[in-house]
Amino acid sequence: MRTHFLLCFLFLFSYLGATEISVDPITFNDAYTNAGDGDVLLLEPGIYASSVTFPSGKTITLKSASATELPEIRFGVSGNDEAIMNGGLIFDGLKIVPSGDYFISVDKVGDIAAIRVLNCTIESVNRCFIRTNNNGYSIGEIEFANCIIRNCGDKGWNFLYPKHIV
């Protein structure tokens, strides 16, 4: 009975910890910076062009708030610090058009929990969608599900280039 109670309490506590936060292109950066582990940023339709750093110690979901009009991501995700550890990003229901050669480009980042791309349209990838460049660390999971990938440029090197162990 105690075990059952404890499990229920922990499940409820973890559920209450995650928050859904509505954002637009103007409020996105502050919400992303202040998001906690498990938080879901509900992106209103618009173009999001402010680059972000890969999260550390938390997994953040960027999800479309609209079922009919996809928010457009036109930024990159970067990281260059081995202190960035055990973070994750989930992209759900977005149109992703990378602004540079890479969409996710992390050089000296430690272990990554997960990168998930769900229900997204990915287009105009210039060189590589995910690039990691730090041997000896790992990515727990890379997942693409129900995505449309199109119009990738002729400069394309390869879609995924992880030096992390996957």
Residue positions per predicted region:
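Acidic Gly/Asp/Thr-rich repetitive segments characteristic of extracellular carbohydrate-active
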Residues: 18-49, 53, 59
